[in-house]
Amino acid sequence: MTKSELVEKLAARFPQLLLRDADIAVKTILDAMSDALADGHRIEIRGFGSFGLNRRPPRVGRNPKSGEKVLVPEKRVPHFKAGKELRERVDRSLERQGDSSSEGEPVSLTAVKAARQAGGHHAAGFPAEATPTLVMSR
């Protein structure tokens, strides 16, 4: 869902709100959340989740062009942790859908390689309409 879609959904749910007013409300909320995170605060929305900051320590990187070592300074990056109610709601939704919807599900690199060797992702047990999504994380 994009910000524009969220604004439209808010305006549709509350007919007394003009689209412009819904847009202002969404922007105001997002600005307040951004400001809080920029100031180092944690945001908790019970039942939905929490936004916080993770620290990435300084490290030595490489300039890809020259190969020269470069010191990458410490960073603080925003992080979202889903709340229990949201996790359970998403899980229940996936259970209701069963195996019929695998779009966007993480697939291991091993499964993708095996599917290619076997003649495509259909041969590896993926539904014909689904294309495996490779998810890489640290």
Swiss-Prot record:
Transcription regulation found in the keyword field: yes
Alphabetized InterPro entries for the sequence: Hist_DNA-bd, IHF-like_DNA-bd_dom_sf, IHF_beta
GO biological process, one term: regulation of DNA-templated transcription
Positions of disulphide bridges: none
SUPFAM superfamilies: IHF-like DNA-binding proteins (SSF47729)
One function term, GO molecular function aspect: structural constituent of chromatin
Compositionally skewed regions (Basic and acidic residues) per UniProt: 81-98
Region (Disordered): 81-138
Classification via SMART domains: BHL
CC annotations in GO: chromosome; cytosol
Protein task: This protein is one of the two subunits of integration host factor, a specific DNA-binding protein that functions in genetic recombination as well as in transcriptional and translational control.
Subunit comment: Heterodimer of an alpha and a beta chain.
Protein name per its UniProtKB record: Integration host factor subunit beta
Top-level taxonomy: Bacteria, Pseudomonadati, Pseudomonadota, Betaproteobacteria, Burkholderiales
